[in-house]
Amino acid sequence: MRLINRLFLALLSCTLSVGVFAQTQDSTVVAAKDSVAPKKTKVFLEHANTLSFDKERNAEAQVLNGDVCFRHDSSYMYCDSAYFFEQTNSLEAFSNVRMEQGDTLFVYGNYLFYDGNTQIAYLRENVRMENGQVTLFTDSLNYERIPDIGYYFDGGLIVDSLNQLSSFYGQYSPSTKLAIFNDSVRLENEQFTLYSDTLHYNTDSKIATILGPSIIVSDSGTIYSSRGWYDTVNNTSLLLDRSQVVSGDRILTGDSIAYNRELGFGEAFGNMSLQDTAQHVMLEGQYGFYNEKSEYAFATDSARFLEFSQGDTLFLHGDTLKMTTVDSLYREVKAYY
């Protein structure tokens, strides 16, 4: 019997380049390379309780205080006070900053610099981006209205209805629902924790795409993989590039593994091996599977069984081998030709 998981995931990638934002002595940030230059439109001041000029501090700025509101196309920006640079089509906003884009995207922070020509918002201090059930937390966020991507570069957290993901660098697109994480990535779920170097995550499907060395730890065991995907809703996964599933003393290895954590069922394709480190036995084949709950294993196509508990190694070959657990000490192996 084979467990066949048929789930197709479109892997999206984003090529990054480096840009520098020097406003108020800010840090180097990473910008999306594929960003299309937006059409230049004017930023409008919609409301402020007071408007004044301070030529000594900044001759080019309109000084605004009280219930300040700006509009740029379909986006609105609110704050307690601001500097409006009409000639350069930009603004600085201070205290209780809020950006609204339609009725689905809201961004909050203590400080905002917005460039109306590039349509990039630089938010700092206690930043929060809300998009439906997805919330992003960080202290430094750059948001490009075109192509609708927000990214942090000094630590951040993204939370949805099921998972919590953190990393040093991350980005999120409200339109595609794709989040990308790099460096010290951690995905926390009620049933497991995933540690990775590089991870993509879809906040709609709740599928995490593994793109670097990763470890998934749960009460039932540990998974080691550097490429593949994990469905956090159904606890199913496809693991590639010689991944391993460890359950107690048993280690299942294969070129690719389809694994269902709820059923405790792993199906390995290509150079499959199941090692019992306590009993010093191993089952090998080009295809096989292992049921953790029944402790039943199957191997076929160049199948062989190895027993090496006594120093010398005993080999058993067959077209198909089946291994069952008799008790805590004994395994029964049957060979078929």
What residue ranges belong to the model's regions?
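Bacterial Sec-dependent N-terminal signal peptides
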Residues: 1-28
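N-terminal amphipathic/hydrophobic interface segments
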Residues: 23-337
